[in-house]
Design a protein with these regions (language model features):
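Active-site neighborhood of phospho(di)ester-bond hydrolases with catalytic His/Asp-centered motifs
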Residues: 5-7, 27-32, 72-77, 103-107, ...
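A basic- and aromatic-enriched beta-loop-alpha substructure that forms the phosphate/nucleotide-
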Residues: 70-144
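N-terminal active-site segment of His-dependent metallophosphoesterases
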Residues: 1-73, 80-87, 158, 165
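Binuclear metal-dependent phosphoesterase catalytic core
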Residues: 205, 214-233, 240-277
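Active-site environment of divalent metal-dependent phosphoester hydrolases
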Residues: 10-16, 34-38, 78-88, 109-111, ...
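Active-site-proximal loop/helix segment associated with metal-binding centers of metalloenzymes
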Residues: 118-192, 197-209
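Beta-strand-turn-beta hairpins that frame and shape the catalytic cleft
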Residues: 1-4, 109-119, 189-190, 247-252
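Active-site-proximal segments of metal-dependent phosphoesterases and phosphodiesterases across multiple
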Residues: 41-56, 160-174, 186-231, 262-264
Length: 277
């Protein structure tokens, strides 16, 4: 099976257009594609005006779904900006629901042939809930200043508040447990984990290797988890705006971000990456 991969497209900075030259069966959109609040119900009659940005985003998803048999989309951190953590994924499912081959995953799976994709943001564990990291990252990263969390309870009650580093660590734990239970005992099946935040410190550029606290907002240390689950053959992520491609046991870990067009040099030379599983 051929799998094409891109993350961190950041359509708010500029459009991106690419073809399926490799004949990939699946395209992975690994988060930070666009901000949820900027995309509304599709109106092909309104191509300018206040919905111009929204229609650009719809056009991007439409092109992807026309050129690739299947498209998997998981949200990153930026999709939530200026919105509510609890409503981001439902909003995308609502406004993009007209695309039948677009699979939006959040702690969910989708299977094609003998490969099961496990998708979700996979926030970090904040350096295993290190107190300094939980405190400092809340001040250092926009994620915890411009994302609300309505904290709805099962009976429908809720209270206003910001999305916090503790919320992120809790969501990390829930995602890891979902992966664990999904792959448990299924050694005859191939699994691909599609996340946004990195599962390993190996996805850290050398210039940042000594920044313990900040790295806690970008990656976790799931190397042993990956080694303990050899049925996971591929793990994709984004978030770092750096290319990575390495092995942890039988699992290939790959990151292929576009980045900020007109702001990062890598974005001007970015190319779609295709893998085989």
């Amino acid at each position: 099976m051929k799998i094409a991969l891109v993350s961190d497209v950041h359509l708010e900075f500029g459009d991106l257009d690419f073809d399926n030259d490799s004949g990939a069966d699946v395209l992975i959109l690994g988060g930070d594609i666009c901000v949820a609040n900027d995309i509304t119900q599709h109106d092909p009659q309104n191509i300018m005006g206040e919905d111009y940005r929204s229609n650009r985003y719809h056009n991007f998803f439409q092109r992807c779904c026309e050129r690739f048999p299947h498209v998997i989309f998981i949200v990153g951190n930026h999709e939530h900006y200026h919105g509510d953590f609890q409503t981001t994924v439902p909003h995308f499912r609502d406004v993009l629901g007209y695309l039948p081959n677009l699979h939006i995953l959040e702690k969910q799976t989708w299977t094609l042939d003998d490969v099961t994709f496990i998708g979700g943001t996979l926030w970090t564990d904040m350096n295993q809930r290190d107190n300094r990291t939980l405190h400092d990252i809340a001040r250092m990263m926009n994620d915890f200043r411009c994302v609300d969390n309505s904290n709805k309870t099962e009976d429908g009650r809720g209270w206003p508040g910001r999305f916090t580093t503790v919320d992120a660590a809790n969501d990390h734990d829930a995602m890891v447990e979902f992966i664990r239970t999904t792959v448990a005992g299924r050694y005859d099946q191939k699994f691909v984990v599609v996340g946004h935040h990195s599962p390993s410190r190996l996805s850290t550029h050398p210039r940042y290797k000594d920044q313990f606290v900040m790295n806690g907002g970008y990656s976790s240390q799931l190397d042993d988890f990956i080694l303990d689950h050899p049925q996971i053959k591929l793990w994709t992520h984004g978030h770092t705006h750096e290319d990575f491609d390495y092995q942890i046991g039988s699992c290939r870990v790959v990151c292929n971000p576009r980045g900020y067009i007109n702001y990062e040099e890598r974005a001007d030379t970015w190319k779609l990456k295709t893998l085989e599983v």
